[in-house]
Amino acid sequence: MSTMGKRILRAVAALAAGAMMLAGSGCASLNGNGGNGTNGTPQNSDKVQTFTPSGGKASATLNIASGSENREVAAAVQKAADESGVAVTLNYMGSLDIMAALENGGVSGGTTYDAVWPASSMWISMGDTKHLVKDAASTSTTPIVFGIEKSKAVELGWADASGKTKPVATTDIIDAVTSGKLKFSMTSATQSNSGASAYLAFATALTGKNEPLSADDLNNTDLQSKVAALLKGVDRSSGSSDWLKDMVVANPDRFDAMVNYESLVIQANKQLTQAGHDPLLAVYPADGIAVSDSPLGYVDRGQNLKDAFSKFQQALQSKDSKLEFERAGRRTGLGGTLTYASDAQVQQSFKADWGINTDASALKTIALPAASVIDQALSVYQTALRKPSYTIWVVDYSGSMKGEGKQGVVDGLNAALNPEQAKASRIEPSGKDVNILIPFASKADEPVAANGSDTASLLSAAANRDPRGGTNIYDGLSKAIAQLPSNVSDYTTAIVLMTDGMSETGDRSKFQSDYAAKGQGLPIFSIMFGDADPTQLDEIASLSNAKVFDGRSGDLAAVFRQVKGYN
């Protein structure tokens, strides 16, 4: 217990310092510094993937901070490793974590990086304050689009029966949201590139000007009200583009629209159609669209790996690698066109009856604003424009939490809910957020609520509650369900369960009945640490279309931020 408590405290300190690693969902890892793979076979784990040349021993190894979306182009990376003779270890994380690593001199969580590969150049522009990044160049592109289930797109008048979509203005999207005809899932703009890029594109298009977003634009109340009206359509948030795609694929009857990379809409459609479901149609906003340019750049720390980097970067531009990029749904041609449009497998990705438009004219790409404006835009999003969150924190105060365990969790709640601490990670509460604390042990306590950014009383209650008794997560969850808002569509709502032990099961059936009757399909995310039972938590996640965050090792503070990215 003491070891776990110390780990929590270290993690919270890391969050307060703003140096956090966000685990990318998707590829599965060996350890924070990569691993030794067999020749020509990517070695996988949930955070790290290592590629070694198939021809024999590597001439060098590059440690790369990579966006988690790059797991989908593993075949292209392997081709480049084979051709260059250079091994690479991709450490998957969010684009904002890559930015933070650059701000820290190419170091994060004790790991040093030789290169960065975020989803967009804007994270290099914002994070490379020490001017370490050299020779950054795009590896491929993919626009951020709406993926809308075919019958819904036809109903909205945005597509015909063949799957061909029509130009849709951002104001048309607002009208569909306002009328109640469109709801969509989208990643958090402060935690994920796809969400941030889409948000910037919406705001830029709604200015009506053919120029980058400005600080004055962000202070315009009319623009703010339009963007807020559009974001009211978000019915599920996420901190990961990959996880968002997987959620939609797993629940096609529950989620019929998402904002995501075109490449992930393509991947989703391959899975949906194989399972006998209708595809999502790609809808490209006609007055402004963001494009992920996926740049790879060398982080010059004096480590003398520039030649190896150049070989690998050049190999990524080879025919073999570019073909694999396009087969995975990325674009490699000038202006967002395809280089290998005649390839049969590329054609199976870029299908017209999925609404995919490979003509460059379909991409009215916005110009990104200055880094300072992006920073301001993300702050305005978090504090004023996003749909408010309604979060119920169900927290374990059983006897095993006594001492450092309790203090660590209390400090973690402060890191997530104290406005000044949370601001460092762009997760600070807005004036309309609602947070509710439900401590539990053998039984659940009465809830403590906090409205807006005034979370002091809730945090005080968390600090003053003494650990004692057993572990009964189900009573805590039933009490949380009773606290769900009647106007649930006005919020992005979630229950967050934190536990360090195996639960008593006497109230399990009651919880399941309560969730079926009143849970409204809302997610119950779990943070698992100590001796928590993953079987129990996985069952809850499966029931509620959520996920379990593993805080048993590594940076637990990052988990707090990651959870808020999903809410």
What are these regions (language model features)?
Residues 36-191:
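N-terminal segment of the mature folded domain
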